[in-house]
Amino acid sequence: MKLAYWMYAGPAHIGTLRVASSFRNVHAIMHAPLGDDYFNVMRSMLERERDFTPVTASVVDRHVLARGSRDKVVSNISRKGEEQRPDLIVLTPTCTSSILQEDLQNFVDRASLYSESDVILADVNHYRVNELQASDKTLEQIVRYYLDRARKEGIFNRSLTDVPSANIIGILTLGFHNQHDCRELKRLLGELGVSINQIIPEGEFLNNLKDLPRAWFNIVPYREIGLMAASFLEKEYGMPYISTTPIGISNTADFVMQVEKLMNFWATVLLGKKFHYDQYVENQTKFVSQAAWFSKSIDCQNLAGKEAVVFGDATHAASITKILSGEMGIRVSCSGTYCKHDAGWFNEQVQGLCDEVIITEDHTEVGDTIARIEPSAIFGTQMERHIGKRIDIPCGVISSPVHIQNFPLGYRPFMGYEGTNQISDLIYNSFNLGMEDHLLDVFGGHDTKGISTKSLSTGGKSIDWTPEAESELKRIPGFVRGKVKKNTEVFARQNNILKITVDVMYAAKERRSIESLA
């Protein structure tokens, strides 16, 4: 176990609660001490929903430690069953309460005798999996539970829908632009002639899960959640699924072609016709998406030779790397993800598209990599935005974890052809425009930022700048000022210099010139 003040993926119980609170009329009981019950506040703040978060904390306090938890947990489950009348109550411990090693399945079995609601214990190992893995497992557990029961009760309908249809698996609360992506995905599928059978877990009733196998195929937009449920449906009911994420021109085209392939598997038999989407892809790429022609414009060509670092969850980091390298001609110096459990897939996706790959959950390692590379822009999470501010490198946020700024009220999808426009804007606006900085530096204006003397590393001694050195640094054009400042501070640390003067600046410049000629 490692102590950290920042985690890219939260603890396992957060993943379970995200899934439970995404379904309609499902309540979650969290067996946890005070301090682990922040999910309600976090979801209420970020999602800005009118409804209360359907999560209750069964608090582990000194009385519980003295007498045991069973009576309290069973009482809370029964009480919530009477008050809320949910279809399902999900009981989950947290990492902290798991230390007590209580038989929570026994609590669930006992509570089921008194509650009219279904009661299950989240089948998650809280010591071995993180938020993303737990959400994937919990969704699969709920889908399996209700499909198995429907089959036993004889209310199971396996017949396919009359028109082509798909299930979208993995849209849930607190996801990165999930609601916007879902709207865009529904629009894209509608234009392809595919109706939506079900979207799970977001906004779906559990009673409808028995109709999941009626769809022609499943779609898993994000690898982080939905793959286990889709694999279960494929294994048990022969339902194929698409796991290609339609982010970017090339990925969206691949996605549409996979939809065509799965549609025609049944369409020739049930409808007596075939679907062809080649012309649709061409029209969307040329006339609907602005990203294709923008990537050939002089504005985008100005980004040629710029370096970028990408870091985030596996789905978004891989997709953005493909867009930067393959579609916009930007050099990706480093691409990485914190999804260590999906490292194999990620390496395969970004192979040949970046100079190096980093797979880590340690934000300090990511920060040191960024400081070493000194890219023109960063594309990452909320933490990479903090890192960028400290070393004066702009950052575009492309992945969870994020704060409230990245739960926009306006329509901001990342998926589909409209998503390509949004991503192109994000990428272009994330880079500092050299001439703009230079003109502001010459003529003045709103750019009144002081010179930051903070270093990324918190372990070394701080380096001070003399007023004369700061004045000299301000005379350097803005688009290279950050790099000059960084190189000077590196030179000072290497030579144990704690105060940077004008002479030190020129000495650092001379050293840099010699190294570049060597």
Swiss-Prot record:
It is found in: Plastid, Chloroplast. Its main location: plastid. InterPro entries: ChlB/BchB/BchZ, LI-POR_suB-like_C, Nase/OxRdtase_comp1, P-CP_red_C, Protochl_reductB, Protochlorophyllide_Rdtase. [4Fe-4S] cluster binds at residue 36. The active site is at 299 (proton donor). Pathway: Porphyrin-containing compound metabolism; chlorophyll biosynthesis (light-independent). It catalyses: chlorophyllide a + oxidized 2[4Fe-4S]-[ferredoxin] + 2 ADP + 2 phosphate = protochlorophyllide a + reduced 2[4Fe-4S]-[ferredoxin] + 2 ATP + 2 H2O. One of its GO terms (cellular component) is chloroplast. Substrate binds at residues 434-435. Keywords: 4Fe-4S, ATP-binding, Chlorophyll biosynthesis, Chloroplast, Iron, Iron-sulfur, Metal-binding, Nucleotide-binding, Oxidoreductase, Photosynthesis, Plastid. Belongs to the ChlB/BchB/BchZ family. This is Light-independent protochlorophyllide reductase subunit B. It comes from Adiantum capillus-veneris (Maidenhair fern).
